[in-house]
């Protein structure tokens, strides 16, 4: 039966007086849509991830979606709990960048089995067959090595990420192939895998300095690891870049104001956020569209600063 306007107003007033909050889950189940997007990132304290999410949220908000952001803190177990929580909340889709610990893809397959969009950015795996947005990590590593060689470096060490992750695998592949291109030897002693935190950078740098012949350049696959390496070099009195060049990755804000400023890679964070959000919206607006996976690869930029030039 039709409800009169008078009754509607009376009900709304009572709801207001009782501070009534609608049941979001019930509403989502009834409508088949929640207008919520789940986002999983490794760390919120990373400028890369926070600025990607900021642009992503701006685009999604402008289309009526709200974002629920969770962080894995690089833990596979926490990432799995985040996925369960987001699915319970009836999100319309999930946008994620995988934790360093993540090897098993079972929980991501769980998202796919729900029939909702899953978009990966920065860290993703080909085996999942989902939309992906990121940079060309292989070419970017080659660009870094080329720059260091042009500055006169001949023994370039790489503080790498764990190799089960596609992006770090591509970075180390680009590094190795560039060394071959410039007729420089590939030495396993000069490659150290780590979680790329500041302490990892410190430990890796100390290990590299213990070698009989130390490197003359460090290429770290993350800025925090580069910062840790720089701290150790300062503590032992090795001049950067005169005695050792240094390049990081991600263009964290601190890289421009430490001394010396650290050369790094600009991944175009806002652009990744915008394209990732638009890819999600396209999936939502065209659910019956023939499934052609989007693999959008952006070209990164090498920002050359004092830590790696004028050797």
Which residues does each PLM region occupy?
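N-terminal helix-turn-helix DNA-binding module of bacterial transcription factors
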Residues: 1-35, 309
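Bacterial carbohydrate/catabolite-sensing allosteric modules
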Residues: 17, 58-63, 81-90, 105, ...
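Short gly/ser/thr-rich secondary-structure transition/capping motifs
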Residues: 17-23, 77, 100, 230
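Interdomain hinge and pocket-entrance segments immediately C-terminal to HTH DNA-binding domains
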Residues: 22, 31-45, 63-65
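N-terminal winged-helix
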Residues: 41-58
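Short beta->alpha connector loops
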Residues: 73-76, 99-103, 224
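Intrinsically disordered, low-complexity polar regions and short flexible loop motifs
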Residues: 94
């Amino acid at each position: 039966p039709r409800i009169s306007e008078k009754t509607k107003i009376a009900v709304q007033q009572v709801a207001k007086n009782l501070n009534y909050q609608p049941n979001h889950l019930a509403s989502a189940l009834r409508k088949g849509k929640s207008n919520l997007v789940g986002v999983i990132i490794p760390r919120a304290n990373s400028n890369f991830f926070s600025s990607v999410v900021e642009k992503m949220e701006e685009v999604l908000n402008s289309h009526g979606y709200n974002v629920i952001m969770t962080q894995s803190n690089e833990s596979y177990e926490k990432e799995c709990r985040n996925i369960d929580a987001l699915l319970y909340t009836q999100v319309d889709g999930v946008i994620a960048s995988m934790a360093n610990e993540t090897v098993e893809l079972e929980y991501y397959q769980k998202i796919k089995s729900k029939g909702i969009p899953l978009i990966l950015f920065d860290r993703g795996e080909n085996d999942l067959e989902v939309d992906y947005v990121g940079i060309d990590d292989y070419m970017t590593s080659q660009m870094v090595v080329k720059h260091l060689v042009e500055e006169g470096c001949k023994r370039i060490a790489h503080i790498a990420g764990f190799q089960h992750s596609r992006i770090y695998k591509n970075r180390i592949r680009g590094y190795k192939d560039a060394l071959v291109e410039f007729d420089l030897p590939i030495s396993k002693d000069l490659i150290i895998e780590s979680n790329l935190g500041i302490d990892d950078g410190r430990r890796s740098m100390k290990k590299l300095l213990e070698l009989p012949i130390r490197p003359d350049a460090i290429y770290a696959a993350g800025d925090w690891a580069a910062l840790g390496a720089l701290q150790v070099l300062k503590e032992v009195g090795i001049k950067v870049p005169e005695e050792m060049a240094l390049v990081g990755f991600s263009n964290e804000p601190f890289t421009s104001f430490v001394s010396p400023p650290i050369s790094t890679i600009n991944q175009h964070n806002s652009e990744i956020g915008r394209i990732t959000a638009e890819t999600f919206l396209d999936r939502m607006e065209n659910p019956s569209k023939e499934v052609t996976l989007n693999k959008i690869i952006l070209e990164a930029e090498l920002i050359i600063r004092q830590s790696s030039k004028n050797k």
